[in-house]
């Protein structure tokens, strides 16, 4: 298996790098007023893939922080995956043309699965499905609404569609540093024939050690946010742990 990828997250709100608690836009903490500088710092530290989310875009249903994303793309040379407000093929292709490596489709995976399949067929290896769940049920529209559909049922829709990975976020843990919900994430990974990325709650080296255990072998990696920003997770220690697996 390829080494586990740690994706440092840059969530964009009003052009700033922020972290939310449980997806609540009213509970946003600004961590860097210059997201491109933050991206450059992550690259310098040795991260090999960035995870970007246009939070305003997720709520608006269209890109809002495009200028900030474009500055990041101009600044770093490592791959970037981007989600938030991407609801049609034109927007997917515009971002791919601007240098985004992988596009994350979340709400669209619930609302318009045929579009997701169309995008994955047109751009194999470049479409990721983002499943954000409360108690195993998928939330949409920037987490403002929770559906009655189980995450695993949606994931199974895309097994043979050309989707390259699933990001599974446990909303109840996101931004709270309570630790990854590895049980639910591993259960999803074992139920579908797709790589799965863990997200929500990563708090310490112990979480990364858990990613390196045999039970987590189907996980492509994990997204880390607040723990990096507030210093609970030392980037170099985390990357060294992954590199030494």
From Swiss-Prot:
The keyword Phosphoprotein does not apply. It is found in: Cytoplasm. Pfam families: His_biosynth (PF00977). InterPro entries: Aldolase_TIM (IPR013785), His_biosynth (IPR006062), HisA_bact_arch (IPR006063), Isoase_HisA-like (IPR044524), Isoase_HisA-like_bact (IPR023016), RibuloseP-bd_barrel (IPR011060). GO terms for cellular component: cytoplasm. It catalyses: 1-(5-phospho-beta-D-ribosyl)-5-[(5-phospho-beta-D-ribosylamino)methylideneamino]imidazole-4-carboxamide = 5-[(5-phospho-1-deoxy-D-ribulos-1-ylimino)methylamino]-1-(5-phospho-beta-D-ribosyl)imidazole-4-carboxamide. GO terms for biological process: L-histidine biosynthetic process; L-tryptophan biosynthetic process. Pathway: Amino-acid biosynthesis; L-histidine biosynthesis; L-histidine from 5-phospho-alpha-D-ribose 1-diphosphate: step 4/9. The active site is at 11 (proton acceptor), 132 (proton donor). Its main location: cytoplasm. Keywords: Amino-acid biosynthesis, Cytoplasm, Histidine biosynthesis, Isomerase. Transmembrane segments: none annotated. Its EC number is 5.3.1.16. One of its GO terms (molecular function) is 1-(5-phosphoribosyl)-5-[(5-phosphoribosylamino)methylideneamino]imidazole-4-carboxamide isomerase activity. Belongs to the HisA/HisF family. PANTHER family: 1-(5-PHOSPHORIBOSYL)-5-[(5-PHOSPHORIBOSYLAMINO)METHYLIDENEAMINO] IMIDAZOLE-4-CARBOXAMIDE ISOMERASE. This is 1-(5-phosphoribosyl)-5-[(5-phosphoribosylamino)methylideneamino] imidazole-4-carboxamide isomerase. It comes from Xanthobacter autotrophicus (strain ATCC BAA-1158 / Py2). The lineage of its organism: Bacteria, Pseudomonadati, Pseudomonadota, Alphaproteobacteria, Hyphomicrobiales.
């Amino acid at each position: 298996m390829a080494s586990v990828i740690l994706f440092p997250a840059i969530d964009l709100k009003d052009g700033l790098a922020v972290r939310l608690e449980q997806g609540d836009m009213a509970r946003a903490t600004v961590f860097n007023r210059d997201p491109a500088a933050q991206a450059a710092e992550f690259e310098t530290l040795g991260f090999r893939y960035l995870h970007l989310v246009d939070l305003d875009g997720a709520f608006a249903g269209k890109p809002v922080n495009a200028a900030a994303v474009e500055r990041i793309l101009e600044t770093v040379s490592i791959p970037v995956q981007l989600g938030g407000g991407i609801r049609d093929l034109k927007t997917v292709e515009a971002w791919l043309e601007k240098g985004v490596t992988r596009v994350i489709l979340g709400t669209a995976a619930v609302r318009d699965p045929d579009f997701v399949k169309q995008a994955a067929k047109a751009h194999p290896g470049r479409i990721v499905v983002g499943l954000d769940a409360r108690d195993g049920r998928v939330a949409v529209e920037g987490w403002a609404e929770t559906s009655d559909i189980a995450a695993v049922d949606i994931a199974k829709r895309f097994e043979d569609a050309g989707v390259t990975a699933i990001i599974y976020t446990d909303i109840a843990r996101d931004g709270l540093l309570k630790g990854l919900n590895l049980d639910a994430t591993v259960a999803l990974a074992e139920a579908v024939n797709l790589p799965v990325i863990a997200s929500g709650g990563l708090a310490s080296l112990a979480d990364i050690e858990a990613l390196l255990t045999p039970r987590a072998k189907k996980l492509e990696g994990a997204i880390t946010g607040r723990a990096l920003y507030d210093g609970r997770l030392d980037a170099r220690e985390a990357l060294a742990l992954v590199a030494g697996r």
